[in-house]
Amino acid sequence: DSYTGTGSGFALSSDGYIATCNHVTEDAKHIQVTGINGDFTRFYNAQVILSDPMTDLSVIKINDPEFKTLGEVNYDLRPDVPVEGEPCYAIGYPRADLLGDNVKVTNGIISAVNAGKAGPVFCQISVPVTYGNSGGPLIDGNGNVLGIISAGYGDKAGYMANLAVKASYLKLLLESDPVLRKLTFKPILVKRSLTEIVRQVKDNVYLIKVSNSEPESSKNNIVTDKSINSIPRPELQDNGNRVSVLYEVKEKH
């Protein structure tokens, strides 16, 4: 089937819940996930369960009779604020149309804990990311999720600033839902080599393909958005300018 965009996502539970970015899924009438258990020959239909445009977060769930399991989730969503200078790694599927559907890993540091006009939800990172990385996990030196890759900005002088949503905001989103708040994670407390981290995490990171039109072959299987929620938080109130700045950043990426 044809698709209009791609993104990345990562497992929240073995039974099919996946985190990604709202801007990846918000206009999609058809969402498919591939790369489950390393298999890119099979595509599974998914639906949006919960989303928050203010934090650019979305939770989807595989809704496909052929689906069995995502396997064990062996990482935590970090509840604390990242630290400037902290090493971090992006795992995802940038430009899958050109670079193929094997997972890509890039590294860098936390450049700033807050991302200026984009607001306290986001941290700035030096990790190279591009189209298709959106929704993928930003991993710390233990293999836990620090953030979710969201946006990037580049100017004519060559300055690049990439943004990730802090994982603590994903935890808040999950806690707003009576089902998702029951999800549990396994904190990894010991630092490991990058090769060990990638080996552990990569099978829980997936390629998401979206289409703005409903394909004829799947009309009976598509399920549209079940619920759209936004979390009320003091630091996110009256932030229309902040959100518009973020979307402007995305358009320039």
Residue ranges of model-derived segments:
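Beta-rich catalytic cores
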Residues: G5, D56, S134
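Catalytic histidine site
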Residues: D1-Q32, S217-N229, K252-H253
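Short loop/turn motifs at secondary-structure junctions and domain boundaries
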Residues: S2-Y3, K117, V127-Y131
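Catalytic nucleophile loop of clan PA
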Residues: F10-A11, P128-I149
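Conserved active-site neighborhood of the chymotrypsin/trypsin-like protease fold
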Residues: S13-G100, A118-F122, P178-K191, E214-E216
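Short, compositionally biased
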Residues: N102-N114
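C-terminal cap/linker of serine protease catalytic domains
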Residues: D1, A28, A46, D64-L70, ...
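Soluble non-cytosolic domains of exported or imported proteins
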Residues: M54, P79-V83, K104, V129-N133, ...
